[in-house]
A protein has these predicted regions:
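Active-site neighborhood of phospho(di)ester-bond hydrolases with catalytic His/Asp-centered motifs
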Residues: 204-205, 265-268
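Active-site mouth of glycoside hydrolases
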Residues: 2-220, 226-229, 260, 293-307, ...
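Catalytic domains of carbohydrate-active enzymes that cleave complex glycans
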Residues: 290-298, 330, 338-353
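Short histidine/acidic/glycine/proline-rich micro-motifs that form metal-
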Residues: 57-59, 270-274
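Charged helix-capping and loop-helix junction motifs
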Residues: 65-72, 244-249, 279-285
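Histidine/acidic-residue-rich catalytic or RNA/ligand-binding cores of hydrolases
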Residues: 275-289, 309-317
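Substrate-binding surface in catalytic domains of secreted glycosidases
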Residues: 233-253
């Protein structure tokens, strides 16, 4: 059955195994390989009901028709397994170890480049192509093409407007021009999506920062965030590097969501590890904190991939997150990771007793 509420979300992020970036994954999309990888996930995790699927506006710009055809075909793959989808429209997480690609800050900051020469950049989502800057036109064409054709698509549970925006110290500075510009752009994406008649809820995949969550809440319908308990985390981030801080952070975000009357999804969670048992231990601890609070989740991530954080060392640069994937390149499940099924809907009642 399709997922019906944020608290019921049980699943994974998905990036195809064959690419090193969003552009690479989508420009060289492999429908057959995707079919195999999603089927593997459903075999290992029968109650998997939601996939957070990363898109690429850069790939769309290079071949719009092919991108849209692959997007629709991919939705069909997920639907054939009873999996609802949260497409991620844009990305602002830029990893220096193995950059996924996405939106650079100079594309959303007024006058920061030749393509953003406007004092009122992203001021009005309803303006036509002849009245806007090049970047507004390009982003608008992408959002229009992707959302308009699926505005009422029951295969889509929600639209994630952007992955991890506001991911810098400036987010806590009310006077920051960067912060103001980024929030304005995010609001523009939300407005554009609603103007297209999207019937699905809107959300934003915020990293673990309460200010970012508070800034993006007014123009989203579901609060999404990325609660990672980081066993290898830095002391400068105690809300992720310590269990005490992690619990306090979850309680703070849960209280905020309740205050606003909105559902809550951890649409990225479970920090990685090269060691299988360490990864399983982190998974068990993290999900044991999320489930009692009624927080749905899409763990990062389902399958080994060449993109950042999802591959073994021999496949490319590996950062602090080490290995976050559940399924190996040969299709086998990492040892002990079947424990993810203990957190499925059918198991939650017994766990609560």
């Amino acid at each position: 059955m399709p997922v019906s509420a944020p608290a019921d979300v049980f699943g994974f992020n998905y990036d195809g195994s064959w690419g090193t970036s969003g552009l690479d994954v989508w420009h060289h999309h492999d429908h057959g390989r995707m079919s195999i990888e999603v089927a593997r996930g459903k075999k290992y995790f029968p109650e998997w009901n939601t996939a957070r699927w990363w898109l690429s506006h850069e790939a769309f710009q290079r071949d719009p028709e092919r991108f849209l055809a692959n997007f629709d075909a991919g939705l069909a793959i997920f639907a054939s397994h009873g999996i609802s989808v949260i497409p991620v429209l844009f990305n602002r997480w830029r990893d220096p170890f193995c950059d996924f690609g996405g939106v650079p800050i100079d594309h959303i900051l007024p006058w920061a480049s030749s393509w953003t020469r406007s004092d009122d950049l992203f001021e009005d989502a309803s303006r036509g192509a002849s009245d806007v800057t090049p970047v507004e036109r390009l982003f608008g064409e992408y959002v229009d093409a992707v959302v308009a054709g699926h505005a009422g698509d029951p295969r889509i549970f929600a639209w994630d407007l952007c992955n991890e925006p506001l991911m810098g110290r400036y987010v806590d500075d009310p006077e920051s021009e960067l912060r103001a510009a980024e929030v304005k752009w995010l609001r523009w994406v939300a407005q554009r999506t609603r103007l297209l008649g999207a019937e699905q809820p809107l959300t934003i995949g915020n990293y673990a920062n309460t200010t970012a969550i508070e800034l993006t809440e007014p123009f989203t319908d579901i609060i999404s965030f990325h609660p990672y308990y980081m066993w290898s985390g830095h002391e400068s981030q105690p809300h992720m590097a310590t269990k005490e801080g992690f619990v306090e952070f979850l309680d703070e975000v849960s209280a905020f969501a309740k205050l606003k009357g909105k559902g809550l999804i951890a649409n990225e969670t479970v920090w990685g590890a090269r060691d299988h048992s360490t990864h399983v231990e982190v998974m068990n601890y993290t999900l044991n904190q999320l489930v009692p609070r009624g927080i749905g989740f899409t763990v990062h991530a389902l399958h080994h991939s060449l993109v950042a954080d999802l591959h073994r060392d021999q496949y490319g640069p590996v950062g602090n997150a080490e290995w976050m994937h559940f399924i190996e390149p040969d299709g086998s499940l990492r040892p002990g990771h079947e424990a993810f099924n203990d957190f499925a809907q059918s198991q939650r009642a017994s766990r609560a007793d």
